[in-house]
Swiss-Prot record:
Ferredoxins are iron-sulfur proteins that transfer electrons in a wide variety of metabolic reactions. The gene is nahT. Residues 5-96 form the 2Fe-2S ferredoxin-type domain. Belongs to the 2Fe2S plant-type ferredoxin family. GO terms for biological process: catechol-containing compound catabolic process. This is Ferredoxin, plant-type. It comes from Pseudomonas putida (Arthrobacter siderocapsulatus). [2Fe-2S] cluster binds at residues 40, 45, 48, 80.
Length: 108
């Protein structure tokens, strides 16, 4: 039997298991979970961006546009290219509100 790791998604604490050869996103989808957004599944769109809060992992190839080196050094990864090497705690990425978004919300 192969090794299995548990991934906990914050906020909310939803959990799913992941095998070492599966991406975190693929493992989540196969278990019918919806705790992370799903995009291209190929590392090119950045929609499934997460921050690894705890645990060991490896990352596959991703678009530098959506995940620059500085972000990777701060623990950010794309779930579609995130391979657990231990139990992980990850955090969903939320884009900071831009002024135009705030202005638009205030007008509504």
């Amino acid at each position: 039997m192969s090794e299995v790791f548990e991934i906990t998604v914050q906020p909310g604490g939803e959990r799913f298991v992941c095998q070492p050869q599966q991406s975190a996103l693929h493992a989540m989808e196969t278990q019918g979970k919806r705790c992370l957004p799903v995009g291209c599944r190929g590392g090119g769109c950045g929609l499934c961006k997460v921050r690894v809060l705890a645990g060991d992992y490896e990352s596959g190839r991703v678009s530098c546009k959506h995940l620059p080196v500085e972000a990777r050094e701060q623990g950010y990864a794309l779930a579609c290219r995130l391979f657990a090497r231990s139990d992980l705690c990850i955090e969903r990425y939320s884009k900071p509100c831009s002024e135009s978004t705030v202005d638009q919300q205030q007008r509504e």
